[in-house]
From Swiss-Prot:
Protein name: Glutamate 5-kinase
The organism of origin for this protein: Rhodopirellula baltica (strain DSM 10527 / NCIMB 13988 / SH1)
Any GO MF annotation of the entry: glutamate 5-kinase activity
Matches recorded under HAMAP family: ProB
Role of this protein: Catalyzes the transfer of a phosphate group to glutamate to form L-glutamate 5-phosphate.
Length: 389
């Protein structure tokens, strides 16, 4: 990095820090456990110390912490992480107690408390649940506590591998509840590299403006026996956070006082800079958290009207309906190429859309006996930039 680009990097980092009102820090299993699989209490304590310093600046501070299953495996003295659902659920419950206890002990001696928040994806799929979670996190902050969020592995079923996918995505979705957020993903590598981190010629990438296919191609994702995420998952989480307007830093959680360095404006890790335009409010929920209840397959004319001209979706542009959904449910939009390009809130139920598909709007009342809406999805309830799960 030359001097001018380094100065620009640092200036952008300082501006982001100045604008940040909420900080979401995610720390992975491999950062929180020792080489023999036990919970690293010293590292938990150092992280808690830095979280308190961030909170002392007046910023809302949220920790998304992995490690429950790993802590449970260590506590029970198991030789390896089980793969069956029943064991994983029980071990997560046992390990979560140790995990939250370690945070509480470290935070309490610094005048704060840990507030355990366990989530599944269903908690964020409904708009009401999405708002309830946000209100709860705000309430925790108002009491001066620090929320420690984890996926609720102990009651998840298939969710152990498919709810959020991993805690990186969970952290990005928690960040999406708020505005003016910085997301920090702490892992066991110092940054995103232009090659394999272990290769001597590989160089760290200090700043990324677009998580495109070229950036994704840099990682060879490996999911370990003690964690569910990988660098690919962190890039997808960064892209999701960026779509909300939130800058993201991927850095080393094993580096001592890494959070202090980030907020000192040092060039730590890789900074993912969001675009100027980003999803807000309800459209953010539609695009990243809401449950998708069905699919509408559109002709090219409808795709062009939506993508190029910002139009609402009319019934005449729908070729086929898949799934069962109600009025107000989120549906995905698929073009003739078979690829999803957007999501939106349907004004009609699935069986109604199937009946009016391909028909002009003026025929809706004749077909259904009523026409509460001229369009199937209003443009204000459409989101085109979708981050793949």
């Amino acid at each position: 990095m030359n001097e001018s680009s380094e100065a620009n990097d640092l200036a952008i980092r300082r501006q982001i820090i100045d604008e940040t009102k909420c900080v979401v820090v995610k720390v992975g299993t491999r950062v929180l456990t020792t080489s023999d699989g036990k919970l690293d209490l010293e590292r938990v304590d150092r992280l808690a110390e830095q979280l308190c310093r961030i909170a002392d600046t007046g910023r809302q501070t949220i920790m998304v912490s992995s490690g429950a299953v790993g802590a449970g495996v260590a506590k029970l003295g198991l030789p390896q992480r089980p793969t069956d659902l029943k064991s994983l659920q029980a071990i997560a419950a046992i390990g979560q107690a140790d995990l939250i206890g370690a945070y509480e002990k470290s935070l309490q001696k610094r005048g704060r408390h840990a507030a355990q928040v366990l989530l599944t994806r269903n908690d964020l799929r409904r708009r009401s649940g999405y708002l309830h979670v946000r209100n709860a996190l705000n309430g925790i902050d108002e009491l001066g506590a620090i929320a420690v969020v984890n996926e609720n592995d102990s009651v998840a079923v298939s969710e152990l591998k498919t709810t959020f996918g991993d805690n990186d995505r969970l952290a990005a979705q928690v960040a999406g509840l708020f505005n003016d957020v910085m997301l920090i993903l702490l892992t066991d590598v110092s940054a995103l590299y232009d090659g394999h981190p272990d290769e001597k010629d590989s160089q760290p990438i200090h700043m990324v403006h677009d998580v495109d296919d070229g950036v994704m191609a840099l990682v060879d994702d490996q999911v370990s026996t003690v964690s569910k995420g990988g660098m690919g998952g962190k890039l997808r989480a960064s892209k999701l956070a960026n779509s909300h307007g939130h800058p993201t830093i991927i850095g080393s959680g094993t580096e001592e006082f890494v959070l202090d360095r980030i907020f000192a404006g040092d060039a730590v890790g890789t900074l993912f800079v969001p675009p100027k335009r980003s999803l807000k409010g309800r459209r953010r929920w539609i695009g990243s958290s809401a449950n998708v209840a069905g699919t509408l397959f559109l002709d090219q004319g409808a795709v062009d009207a939506i993508q190029k001209h910002g139009r609402s979706l009319l019934a005449i542009g729908i070729q086929r309906v898949e799934g069962t959904f109600a009025h107000g449910n989120v549906v995905r939009l698929v073009g003739p190429n078979g690829e999803e390009f957007g999501r939106g809130l349907s004004n009609y139920r699935s069986h109604e859309v199937a009946r009016i598909a391909g028909k002009p709007s003026e025929q809706i009342e004749w077909i259904l006996g009523h026409r509460p809406y001229e369009n199937v999805i209003h443009r204000n309830n459409l989101v085109l930039r979708i981050v793949p799960e």
